[in-house]
């Protein structure tokens, strides 16, 4: 697919100029912004530009398939909301139907809503999880649920129980009338889709073109990662000492690969973290593909007594670790300077790669000496390239990367 390259490669700021408008606005504001945006594309090396356009086309196609679906996978894509029948969506676990709301109080704003499952529905077939974004809509009893025939509320799954399910509305309602009006109707829940996750991938690819040439050459495998054989361990990790030393001597990049259940997280991640914390004034980012893996990392940190801040949504984190969320910890800060101090003094940050990708401003406040990425073999390059290319003050925001993954595992 060369359409994107044919469009973007010759594109100039003047070609994007509106026919009407202030000359001063154009010359002093709009033109400089557009030229700064396009410059990394025009100034990139042929290899970097080819890499950029190849993955730009890949992400574009992935976004398209997320909307219209894949012919090889039945019921995929957001278009399944109106293309697939309710029975098909129930069979694939992509719909809750015949849900009845527990009516909230008549007065006051409605931020959460709880709905009961039908008695006959087999919930074990569902592929919904806490933290998933969903749509919620009513439909008349005796008819098939159809999101295109009624109003739709957007929400996030807060909790999934054995008899009921709780949602947090993305746009809280002013009162309960919207639910009491449909009290004789059933309600259905289906998966939602946000484009913001793809926006972060596009932003990350552009960050790759803006990265220092030395980091670009490393990511494109144009040079060997640097190693410092003079570095020695400060801690003792028993049988892990040999591997821990090799990881420490790697200056920029290390791959830790092994079969499932071999202790890559329990020993590899934890001991690498503990060794890095023995160095003064170092800061570490711990990432994984799924929130479940991040919960596991948080459990290891809690067991070791290591303080950390977690990036992400409270609904995606296990209840035991929500008190460590950045959004929770800042509630104790009375001033903006206290928030900055909290971020600067906390040495360990934890979150999914998606959460870190969604917070590019964090790297302007916080630079990391080490990033350890668990479940790395489940990730595709566009999920990582923005993180590995992030810069602050002209230098990589992450100095060293350790990727941990299962042997011969395909991306999720």
Segments (PLM) and residue ranges:
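Pre-Walker A (Motif I) flank of P-loop NTPase domains
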Residues: 250-256, 281-282
């Amino acid at each position: 697919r060369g359409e994107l390259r044919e469009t973007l490669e010759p594109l100039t700021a003047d070609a994007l100029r509106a026919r009407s408008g202030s000359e001063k606005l154009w010359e002093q504001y709009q033109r400089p912004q557009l030229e700064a945006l396009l410059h990394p594309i025009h100034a990139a090396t042929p290899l970097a530009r080819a890499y950029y356009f190849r993955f730009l086309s890949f992400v574009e196609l992935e976004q398209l398939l997320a909307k219209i679906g894949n012919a090889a996978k039945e019921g995929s894509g957001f278009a399944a909301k109106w293309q697939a029948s309710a029975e098909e969506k129930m069979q694939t676990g992509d719909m809750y139907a015949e849900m009845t709301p527990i009516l909230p109080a008549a007065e006051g704003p409605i931020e959460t809503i709880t709905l009961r499952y039908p008695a006959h529905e087999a919930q074990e077939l569902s592929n919904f999880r806490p933290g998933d974004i969903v749509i919620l809509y009513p439909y008349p009893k005796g008819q098939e649920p159809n999101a295109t025939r009624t109003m739709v509320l957007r929400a996030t799954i807060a909790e999934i129980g054995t008899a009921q399910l709780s949602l947090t509305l993305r746009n809280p309602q002013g009162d309960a009338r919207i639910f009491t009006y449909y009290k004789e109707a059933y309600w259905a829940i289906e998966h939602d889709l946000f484009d913001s996750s793809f926006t972060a991938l596009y932003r990350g690819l552009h960050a790759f073109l803006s990265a220092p040439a030395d980091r670009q050459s490393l990511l494109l495998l144009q040079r060997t990662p640097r190693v410092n054989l003079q570095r020695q361990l400060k801690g003792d990790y028993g049988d892990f000492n040999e591997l821990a030393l090799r990881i420490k001597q790697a200056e920029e990049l290390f791959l830790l690969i092994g079969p499932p259940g071999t202790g890559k997280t329990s020993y590899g991640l934890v001991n690498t973290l503990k060794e890095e914390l023995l160095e003064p004034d170092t800061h570490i980012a711990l990432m994984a593909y799924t929130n479940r893996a991040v919960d596991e990392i948080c459990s290891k940190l809690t067991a070791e007594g290591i303080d950390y801040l977690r990036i992400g949504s409270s609904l995606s984190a296990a209840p035991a670790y929500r008190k460590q969320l950045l959004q929770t910890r800042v509630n104790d800060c009375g001033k903006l300077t206290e928030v900055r101090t909290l971020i600067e003094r906390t040495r360990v940050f934890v979150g999914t790669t998606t959460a870190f990708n969604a917070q590019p401003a964090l790297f302007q406040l916080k630079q990391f000496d080490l990033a350890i990425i668990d479940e790395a073999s489940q990730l595709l390059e566009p999920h990582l390239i923005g993180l590995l290319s992030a810069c602050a003050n002209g230098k990589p925001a992450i100095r060293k990367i350790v990727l941990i993954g299962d042997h011969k595992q395909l991306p999720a």
